[in-house]
């Protein structure tokens, strides 16, 4: 998909920058004859693997749920990690979620799931993927339906692995080193907002958006290649926030007509949307010189705000996000709702004195924006 370009004030002042969308995943469905059932192949592009560490604040959260279930073939018990998507499922879908997660983590070839409904299986699989941005060794799945006459009596689920267990373990060890180096900078005193802002800034500021990079639908491209697309950004955001004890899930859909992925996160007990891809200035303004600018317009936004550009595909039942306390501009005191030259002057004057290359401020309306721009220009702040 093509990059979208938006331009606001040049040079020192950056105001309310908007970004563009990227490719998420493609789906393939094939039917072939089989006895006594049918085989259908589906491919979704998303990734995950789960590894919990004791990073500051990780143990304080209560939303993550785990279930220990023994596998039928006697392999070691797999601790099933549940996230936001799991909580939106029916009891039947939740049971299949556990079965899908278990076989993926064990990297077994197949499992007979406890449903005969292909839509239930698809919902469970996509929910596992949405909850687990760390799974990078699966690109989709095959399923085999077994029938008696016209009645489906059972379904086998077979993950489509992109690598063997040895290669997976190798990549995971490399990812662990990078992730540890990122999260070691998190301060024990930080709350949800500070942790989420750190993850957002790290990914938006250090990972380049590039369509053609290898493994761009998973976290390998993010942590090892430092180049990715929206799916990689969203998966990495979910993974890092989960390790920090912040509930997060990957949301898929479209943004300005292009397939896209972003995140739903819970900060201080309230839900917000976050789009790390659109936080990367090089994605939108790579040709205008703002290579180090971070766009905060999609950090901690409401449903009403994100719906102007993003449309979820219905995979997840999403809440109506109305909280604004942890929106970047509100939290940082950079959301201007009424004209006050002293406030605006102080924000940009401080940034100028601190040699901040760009400063982002959001205004309630165009009239306030124009007032601020004129005021700053005539006061020779820029």
Regions inferred by a protein language model and the residue ranges of each:
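Sterically constrained small-residue positions within well-ordered secondary structures
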Residues: 104, 148, 221, 254-256, ...
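Hydrophobic/aromatic-rich core segments of domains that either
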Residues: 232-305
